[in-house]
């Protein structure tokens, strides 16, 4: 299974989700991350995301931001959006209904149908990154439990 994690800039939430899933992945799965905007293309994850990942025994230093592309619909089986704005932006790019059906809100993995958001911690302090990490870990654990 190939999974893509998507947030706005691909420097805060999706790199954390990418790192968490990568650390827990079954061997035959792969994961990547992207952003719906290209503002930070080629940059490393936000230092606060890197710090939060390290606190939890995960390295995300090797990741580089990239922008979501239409070709990602072909390359991935599941595309997780961090919030409804990114969800809408991704679905809008879908070439067909089958592609659009690959897009999910990640928090629906633990709160089905509630469409809860993973807040963007970019403008806040380190505690926001800790909260986001915990949310993502719970959602990813639920996804793995149902799909392995």
Predicted regions and their residues:
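Conserved active-site segments centered on acidic
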Residues: 1-75, 145-148
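Helix N-cap/beta->alpha junction signal
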Residues: 14, 83-84
């Amino acid at each position: 299974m190939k999974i893509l994690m998507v947030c706005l800039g691909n420097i805060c939430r999706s790199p954390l989700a990418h790192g968490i899933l990568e650390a827990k992945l079954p061997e035959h799965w792969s994961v990547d991350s992207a952003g719906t905007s290209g503002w930070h293309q080629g940059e490393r994850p936000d230092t606060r995301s890197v710090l939060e990942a390290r606190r939890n025994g995960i390295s995300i230093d090797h990741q580089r931001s990239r922008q979501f592309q239409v070709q990602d619909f072909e390359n991935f089986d599941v595309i997780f959006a961090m919030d409804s704005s990114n969800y809408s932006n991704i679905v809008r790019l879908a070439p067909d209904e089958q592609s659009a059906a690959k897009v999910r809100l990640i928090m629906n993995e633990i709160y089905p149908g509630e469409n809860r958001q993973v807040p963007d911690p970019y403008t806040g302090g380190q505690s926001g990154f800790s909260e986001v990490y915990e949310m993502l870990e719970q959602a990813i654990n639920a996804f793995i439990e149902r799909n392995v």
